[in-house]
Every structure is written in structure tokens, then in C-alpha cells.
């Protein structure tokens, strides 16, 4: 399916935006903390991506890269700055720019949003601030508020370096030892090379690694220390929480905390069998795709 890719310019960093056009409801994917749209919603296994699935169902599929990721502009590497780049308020402002473009271009007054992991924090903040722009909200592996002190160190960093080996270890750590692998591409051979390709400097590091903003780590630490940057009570759209059976980031308790506080009466929690926090890259992706598209297709109450 034909995909348009362009850089959205304006007030702020240039943002890479993807679109697979259809006349239906626009659906925007909001990626997580470590890899951009090309490696998530737009990545094709056996010739098919999640964006392709949305498009085939009649949805106008959109995605973008936050500043500091993929094809978008990088934050300034100012060693003198104490600000941690890539925090949720900055990310929510970038979502606002993308949604404004979608609304202007398509004529739809509101869109559906599917966000993953740390991206749910930025998406939740945006949806709380702009309820008129969000028709439906899907929180895939969301970060919930906890009341356990989580430290990120005495001197928070501005950047992280992430290797393919670290990504793979993270992807498989929640799978029970007695269970076969669940990744569609077990060794991440092609995915890993594509991941390193999202950072022009990655190959020059030893070991090769992708540089990403540290903001998401700080946001998650705050959330798990009792300070989520958005209030679920402020959400005014039907909301789906979707997570894997083996998701170590979004626990049953986390899902229950969010579900009990969401502000719209239509709120659901779907747990996908044999899936982890990264199930869009796993064999369980079909269950994820089905749960999300069925929710997106429902008539607004």
C-alpha cells in the first residue's frame, strides 16, 4: 500500500509524518520510548504492517516520529542545558501539531489515537487537553501511576544509547523460560539493522547504538513515584486499554488503576494471550490488531 512520508515543519522541530490514505476515520499511532514509527506501526513482517491492517479496514492511517527519533529533527546537544529532552509535555505539543495538520487536511474534526508504552503518557496528556480532537483512544501497554519511589540516579542524563542486543533482551525478558520465542523475527536480524539505520551515528559507536532522548525514562520514573503527567479522569473519549498476558510493564494492577479512573463510561481492558509489552513485533500481534480495530470500528455512543 502506498505510503506518503514528509517532514512537518512549523513551530518546533521538523517531524517525520507517515500517511496511508483512505477516506475513513484518521487513526494516529504514537510510538514509545525507544524506537520510531518505521520500526513499529509501519514495520512490515511478511509484507504487512499494522498501518496496512488499518488501511485495509478503511481507516486513514497516520504515524509520526517524535523529535529525537527516526526521521525527525534532533534536540540540541547542549551540554550546558539542565533540561532533559523529550519529556511528555514536549511530546504532547508535537502530537498537537500533527493532529492539527491531520484535521486541516482531512476535514475530520476528531481522530482516533493509538499510543504505545511511554507514548501513552504524551497521548493521554494531549487527549486531556484537547478532548474535542480525540474520538477514540487506545492505550497499548500504558504506563500507569504507582506509588513506589523510582530513582533515575542523582544526575539525570540527557540521552540514552540503546544497542540491538539491549532491545532484544528487553523484548524477550518477560516470556516464560519454558515457552518458545514469540518474536516474529527471533534474532532481530533485519529489524536490528533497520533500527541502527534510524541514527546516522549509530554505526560509529562501539558497540553500535541508537541515541535517544532521556525524557521518557524520567517520565516513567515520575509516574512510578506517584506523579503521572495526565489525569485519566480528564479523558472524554471511549478508551481501550490493551496489553499482553506477559507484559511486565503494564500489570493487572496498572490496568485496573487506569480503568477505574478513566473519564468516559466506555472503557475496556483487553489482555492478549501470550503477548508481552512489544506484541506488535510478536506472533500475538494478530490478537492486538483485532482488539484495536474492533474497538475503532464501534459506533460512538
Indicate residue ranges for each PLM-predicted region:
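Glycine-rich "HGGG/HGxG" loop immediately N-terminal to the catalytic nucleophile
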Residues: 64-85, 277
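Short, surface-exposed "cap/lid" segments of acyl-processing enzymes
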Residues: 25-63
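Conserved alpha/beta-hydrolase "acid-adjacent" motif
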Residues: 248-254
